[in-house]
Amino acid sequence: MKRRKVSFVCSGNTCRSPMAEGIFRSAIKRRKIKFVDAASAGIFAENSKEINEKSAACLTARGIDFSKFHPRQLKHKMIETSFAVICMTRAQKELLNSFDNVYSMDEIAGSEIPDPYGQELSVYQKTAEIIRQAVDKIIDRFFHDEYPRNNSAGNHKK
């Protein structure tokens, strides 16, 4: 089966999209979904050097390894090779509107992901929880037939 990649996009690839990537990877591993991967990038990430320390703290608290993470600039090739590109806001999606595989979190999860940059750790923690809930909706929308459910043997594709 061909591997499918979900790419998460925010502005600088230091706060929201790395949290979304890490939380998504954790969720697909927990649900035993195979042949799906995650990535993240920023629309304006040219000068980004590392993940925001508060975003890192949120991932660490959730037991998510981000040690190999490095912020990167979004490139056309990444969009073209992704199964789905999910932007944190409608405005970010509008910048990429010429691609058919680009969505906003609002379209999938019912709300945008607010930017916690420069705020208290508690705001980052709340953002991480909003992302976790959105990730569940993303998986349910795009991969609902690919993970086993309790007491539902035979009701999913292998």
Task: Kindly give the residue locations of the regions a language model identified.
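Conserved active-site segments centered on acidic
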Residues: M1-E80, D140-K158
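Phosphate-binding/catalytic loops
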Residues: A84, M88-K158
